[in-house]
Amino acid sequence: MTNSSPRVKRRTDTQYLHSVSSKLPKVDFDTNNEEFFEEEFEIYDPFYRAELPCPKPSLSISKHSIAKVPSNVNKRLELQLLLTSGTFLPNSRPYLSERVRKHTHLLSNSITGDDKPSLIHVDFTPEECFILQEAKLKFGPVNSVQFNDAYSTHISPKLPGRAYEDCQKFEIDNPSLSPVDKHGAIILRTYKKNKKLLPDYLKSFYNAGSSYFQREQVHQLMDGESVFFLKPWKHFNETSGDTVCVAYNPLCEKFALGSTAQDGAYNRLGNLWIGDFHSETIQSLESHYKLNQVGEKEYSTISDLCFSKGNLFLYTGAFDNAVKVWDMEGNLCGIFNAPTDYIHKLALSDDDLLAVACKNGYGYLLSTDNSTGEILTSANLIYPEALEKGYSASLIEFSNFLGRSSDKVIIGYDSFHTSNNRGCLALFDASTASFVQKFNTADEAFTSLYMHPSQVGFVASSNTLSNGRVYYLDTRMYKVCLNFTTTQKDINHATISNSGILVTSSGTDNQTFVWDSRKPDKPLSLLKHGKTKMIHFDGANEEEVDAGINMAQWQPKGNLFVTGGSDGIVKVWDLRLNNPFIQNFTEMNSAITYGGFSEDASKLTVCCVGGDVNMYSLGNDNGNKFGEFRIIENRLLT
């Protein structure tokens, strides 16, 4: 049926049909004639929808329905537009005077009974200004008795949500009551009264005794538990490779970053950086490199660095077989290039005597000029047996006695470069640069040295073919007092707690063993990290190829222990507790390569694979976001 075809209602009344048929002339019906049916009957339309009677009227949609806000709409800006457009009228539209609005920052983060944002100010819209102007012409100034009497009955209904006091404040700020060029709203951020200002860990101390939080102990709390109050501060990712060493000067005004260097086309500047905390600047120091066969610079891995005790110089060692001295402005002051192989480790005495461990098996002692940084003298530390066996000097530390460095130097040897797990631990006299003794340890490759900052002991870890071992040594007798055996095949870090009682061993298995030195036979705790973020070949022994835990730090002057593993997570522990885990401090995108506190515990630097460096600081106001350092001109040296 076409659109022009008339619609004929069908009748089923037989009497009506009989009366009509009696009046029509008799004709022969040709049922095969389609035109006959088209003229007398409506052709069936399958798409025709008959209107059926509705037994119940439809219900209207509620007028309070709220349209769904698109996901790309800024809800905060949308609310401000609604508040100032006059189309959205809350129960209260308060007005703050201009003088008070200049100090609204003092109201932020206020404590309220709920966690909903509070509306504290809404500017008068142009429509409201015109209403006030008309009322002023009729009833006089806003701050008058006649206006006040008329407000509740004649004016308030036209200004929903406005109090008479709001109009008074607005007249003081704007005597003409004329519309302002820009108008908006102020919403106060709030938080609940029961929000945790301190972690549950500290809350437990508070419940145990409030004297812990008395005024004279607040400084001790911040020193010992500062990791809970550290906030994101700076992010940096311009290094040449993975950052493997970080140093702070004693005043915590400067810092330095040392990174690995890549081979071939990926080798680039950025292996050594020095930064300033106050000016928030950082610069690259270009000097640790070698010239290849075609005369191009190939930058070397920075293996270790440290600042002088007098805050004047930075000492750096690298795989270019050199030790270099820099001033605080990044100027090169001295070079020691006598070593014939990689520099592995640096150590500094309280008198700024520098000790160096080299891959060729030698140790070196360097004295520098206190004013210019020039290297004045050098002496070799030689253990003949280690040289004969081809050991590498991989560790070096000045011995400590009750918080002061002594004239004794400890060197740890290994033979990893020959795929051998052999080595030893030796003692030297720095005053005469002479060998004193070999420690009574097994001939095992030593992997870490940790000198207690204020006690009379230190720990050294070693690897055997099947397991690991940690030795606890006394600096008064220079003998092994205790040893702890672990199933770890490769130990990255061994440490002693600030109390001198707890000993830890962190390895490539992404675990840390903890012992009580009073009961050395059995581990006290086992601290575990999660699944590694490093990529390994199928079938590889993960413990042999994974980086494991590369960060094992005690909170300075405190009891907290902080670890960072190849799962990219930095964890905080209190090893005095039965359940030592406290919280995850942060999570990086890849495996942790280094982490360390500043001496005053006000800074913490965490580095991961790929070169990312995150710095956390006390007292910053970055809104939990990382800022950036300003990079200044490189020091180009030849």
UniProtKB/Swiss-Prot annotation:
Q: Which GO terms describe its cellular component?
A: chromatin; CLRC complex; cytosol; mating-type region heterochromatin; nucleus; pericentric heterochromatin; subtelomeric heterochromatin
The subunit structure is: Component of the Clr4 methyltransferase complex (ClrC) composed of at least clr4, rik1, pcu4, rbx1, raf1 and raf2. The cullin pcu4, rik1, raf1, raf2 and the ring-box protein rbx1 are components of an E3 ubiquitin ligase, whose activity is essential for heterochromatin assembly. Interacts with nup189.
Species, as recorded? Schizosaccharomyces pombe (strain 972 / ATCC 24843) (Fission yeast)
InterPro entries per record: G-protein_beta_WD-40_rep, WD40/YVTN_repeat-like_dom_sf, WD40_repeat_CS, WD40_repeat_dom_sf, WD40_rpt, WDR55_POC1
Superkingdom in the source lineage: Eukaryota
Q: Does the keyword Ribosomal protein apply?
A: no
Q: Name any Gene Ontology BP term.
A: subtelomeric heterochromatin formation
State where the protein is found: Cytoplasm; Nucleus; Chromosome
Q: Where are the WD repeats?
A: 297-336, 486-525, 544-583, 587-626
Recorded protein name is Rik1-associated factor 1
The signal sequence is none
- What function does the entry list? Component of the Clr4 methyltransferase complex (ClrC) which contributes to the establishment of heterochromatin by specifically methylating histone H3 to form H3K9me. ClrC preferentially ubiquitylates H3K14 and ClrC-mediated H3 ubiquitination promotes clr4 methyltransferase activity for the methylation of H3K9. H3K9me represents a specific tag for epigenetic transcriptional repression by recruiting swi6/HP1 to methylated histones which leads to transcriptional silencing within centromeric heterochromatin, telomeric regions and at the silent mating-type loci.
Keywords tagged on the record: Chromatin regulator, Chromosome, Cytoplasm, Nucleus, Repeat, Transcription, Transcription regulation, WD repeat
Phylogenetic placement of the source organism: Eukaryota, Fungi, Dikarya, Ascomycota, Taphrinomycotina
